Amino acid sequence: MGFSFVTNAAIAAHMPPSKQEIIRRDAKFHPTIWGDHFIQYLDTPIDPPQKVVERMEELKKQVRAMLRDTNLDISLIDWIQRTGIAYHFEEQIAETLKHVYEASTLTTDSSKYLEHFDLRHIALRFRLSRQQGYHASTDVFKRFMDEGDKFKQSIANDIEGMLSLYEASFMSVKGEAILDEALAFTGKNLEATLPNLTGSLAQQVECALEIPLRRCTDLVKARRSISCYENKNGRNEVVLELAKLDFNLLQAVHQRELALLTSWWNELGASTNLPFTRNRVVELYFWVLEVLSKPEHARAREIMVKSIIMASILDDVYDVYGTLEELQLFTSALERWDLQALEQLPNTIKTAYSIVLRVFKEYEDLLKPHEVYRVGFARKALIPYMNAYFLEAKWFYSHHHPSFEEYMDNALVSCGYPFLFLVSLVGLDEIATKDVFEWAIKRPNIVVAASMICRNRDDIVGHKEEQERGDVPSGVECYTKDHGCTEEEACMALQAMVDDAWKDINCELLHDTSMPKAILMRAVGLARIISILYQYRDGYSDSTHETKAHVTQVLVQPIPL
C-alpha cells in the first residue's frame, strides 16, 4: 500500500523581464499550517504488526458469523457501515439488505409484516434499502401521519424514531413530499430536544443535525460514529474493537502516503517558484481521501491528489496572478499541449505549465500499458476546465457582471468537478473501462449535481471574502442582481439548489442506473467533502478552523484502544 512518486527534471527557461511593471493581485492566503509535519511518517513500516493483522482477522471472522445469523438485528449493519468497516463485508451485507428489501416490499403480506416494527426500525430499513440502491417506497411512513399528511405529534416523544426518520429523509428524490415533511418535522423537533439529551443519543443527534449520514464523508463519519458507538448501551464489542483497529491501521497508511506526498511537493518547488499559490497539500489529500478512501484505491488516490494539487495551482494562476495576455498565452499552450509552447510563456506561467506536463507524465508512469488511453481523457477534460477559468478572467478584466444563468453555465465547469471526477477514475482497476470514460467525459447528471453542490456551497460561505479580494461576482451577487432580492434570499435560493442536487444524486444511485455503483460513488464522495469543507466558511482557503480539526481527527490522532 502507498504511493510511488516519480520525479522528473524541472523544465527551466527564463524570459527577459518586462519593461513595464505589472501590478499583481494578492489574495493573502495564509501559509500552510502543517508544513513538513507528515515527513516524520516516511519511516513508518509499510506492513502493520502481525499481531494486529491476526486479531483483525479473528474479529472479521466473528462479524461474518453474526451477519449469517437469520435473527440479525439490522441495526448492527447500520453501525458496521457507520464505523467504516463495511468494506470488509460487502457481499454479506448486500445479501442481507436484499432480503430486507424483499420482505418489506415484494411479499404479498409486506404491509402486515411491517406492522411489527416501530418508527426507528421502519426508517432504518428504508434508509439502508435506499443506500443499497433499492427504490423503497415512502408509503411505509403513512401510518405515522395524520389525515392532513402531517406527522403525528406523538412521535416527537420517540427520539430514536425521529432521529432514524430524520436520517432517512436525506435519501429522498424529487417529488417525495412525505420525506420533505419528515425532514421539516424531525429537524425542528430534534433541535428543540437536543439540550435535554445526554450520552450517546445526544452525540448522535448533534452529529446528525450538523451533517446527516448521507452527506458526511466516510472517515469523518467513522471517527464520529466510533465515539458514539463506544458510549452506546448494548454496543457490540467485536464491531467496536474491529472499527478502532481498522481506523488506526488505515490512518497509518494514509500518514505514510502524506509523507511521500509532502516530499513530492517540496521537490516540485511550487512554494518557492509560485509563492502566490496556496500550499494546501494536507487539505487536498484529505479532500481526495474522502473520495477514494478504500485501501485498494492507493494508486487512484495518488493520481487524483496530484491532479487536485495541480488544479489548485492553476486556480491561483488564473484567479490571482496572471494578466489577461499571460492567461491567453497559457490557455492556448494548454490547448496545443506541446513542449515548444514553453518558449513562448513568461517565466512564472512556464513554471505552472511545466507542472501540468509533469503531472500528466506521472499519470502515464503509474498506469499499465493498456490503461494509458485514460490520460487522453484526462487531458480532454482539462481543456474546458481551463477555458472556464479563462472566461472568468476575461469577465474580471472587462468588469463584466454575468447573469446568473451565464454564471452557472461556466461555474459548473470552473468549479473543477467534471475534471476531478474523471481523474478520480484514472487510477481505478478494471472497473473503469473505456465506456466509463466515454460516459464521464460527457458530464453526466450525477457529476452536474456534485458540481452544483460544490459551486453553490463555495459561493454561499465564501462570496464575501471573494468580493473583498475583488473577484468576479459569485452566484450570490449574480442571483441578487437578476432577482432583485437580498443577499440572504439569494443564499437560501442557492441552498435550495444544493438540496435538489442531492436529490438528483440519490435518484442516480437507484438500481436502474447503467453505471457501476463503485463509479458513481466517486461523485458522491466529491459532494460529501463539500459538506465538510464548506459548511461554515471556505475551509480550503482558510483551513485553520473546522478543516484543521477534521484533518487532526482523521490523519493525526489515532483512536485510543
Swiss-Prot record:
GO BP terms, alphabetized: alpha-copaene biosynthetic process; diterpenoid biosynthetic process; green leaf volatile biosynthetic process; sesquiterpene biosynthetic process
Residues reported in the UniProt entry to bind Mg(2+) 3: 458, 466
Example of a GO MF term: alpha-copaene synthase activity
A Pfam entry, by short name: Terpene_synth_C
Motif (DDXXD motif): 315-319
Binding residues for Mg(2+) 1: 315, 319
InterPro entries linked: Isoprenoid_synthase_dom_sf, Terpene_cyclase-like_1_C, Terpene_cyclase_plant_C1, Terpene_synth_N, Terpene_synth_N_sf, Terpene_synthase-like, Terpene_synthase_metal-bd, Terpenoid_cyclase/PrenylTrfase
UniProt pathway: Secondary metabolite biosynthesis; terpenoid biosynthesis
Expressed in which tissues: Mostly expressed in stems amd leaves, and, to a lower extent, in roots and fruits.
Record's comment describing the protein's domains: The Asp-Asp-Xaa-Xaa-Asp/Glu (DDXXD/E) motif is important for the catalytic activity, presumably through binding to Mg(2+).
Entry function: Sesquiterpene synthase involved in the biosynthesis of volatile compounds that contribute to the characteristic flavors of black pepper. Mediates the conversion of (2E,6E)-farnesyl diphosphate (FPP) into alpha-copaene and germacrene D.
Family: Belongs to the terpene synthase family. Tpsa subfamily.
Protein name: Terpene synthase 3
Gene from which this protein is expressed: TPS3
